[in-house]
Amino acid sequence: MNAEDHTPELSARERILLTAHDLFYSGGVRATGIDKVIAEARVTKVTFYRHFPSKNDLIRAYLDYRHERWMNWFKDALNRHGATNGQRLNALVPTMAEWFNNPIYRGCAFINTVSELGGVLPDVLEISSRHKQDMTNVIAELLPETPNRLAIANAAAIAVDGAIVKAQLDNNAKLAALQGLSMLLSALNMQQ
């Protein structure tokens, strides 16, 4: 993905951020140099550094943008897959299948970035923790209000994260991840 793929009406900052998003997600944060982002966003170094004084600033903006984008998709996908009907927790399986089968799927941007930079950039841990908590909160909203609602939501979120990591391995792993997630969610449904 490069800046040509983004509409010319976008500001330089938006082109930089969208280009970084695509490059960081597809190739990793550490492996993607600022010069590549600058070239593909078709901006000058001066323009880049005016908007993002350091790569760390760009990483934070990338994670914030990814969080907003992914959460909007997640809520929408859950609704499309039946989260508003009876077995609401079961909507997680087709939602994850939709994501896993996307040709650009490369796992969770937050898990990936924490594994790359969590020990050296504390903001990555903070943003990623917020993302995972927000995901858990959305899952909790699928559940009836019972005393163990939060415990079930936390367990479901952990199962989702495990499926996300497993699905990165290959196509066979995607199927196994979805089957395992389905089994775990069925067990959690019995706890309600």
Placement of each model-derived feature along the sequence:
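Secondary-structure edge/capping motif, primarily at the C-terminal ends of alpha-helices
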Residues: 81, 117, 167-171
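Amphipathic alpha-helical segments used for helix-helix packing
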Residues: 101-123
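N-terminal intrinsically disordered/low-complexity leader segments
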Residues: 1-11, 192
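Alpha-helical DNA-contacting segments of helix-turn-helix folds
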Residues: 59-66, 73
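Amphipathic alpha-helical packing segments from all-alpha helical-bundle domains
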Residues: 68-71, 87-90, 120-144
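Hydrophobic alpha-helical connector segments
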Residues: 61, 75-102, 153-156
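Hydrophobic/aromatic-rich alpha-helical bundle segments in the mid-to-C-terminal region
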Residues: 124-130, 145-192
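Helix-turn-helix
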Residues: 2, 15, 19, 23-57, ...
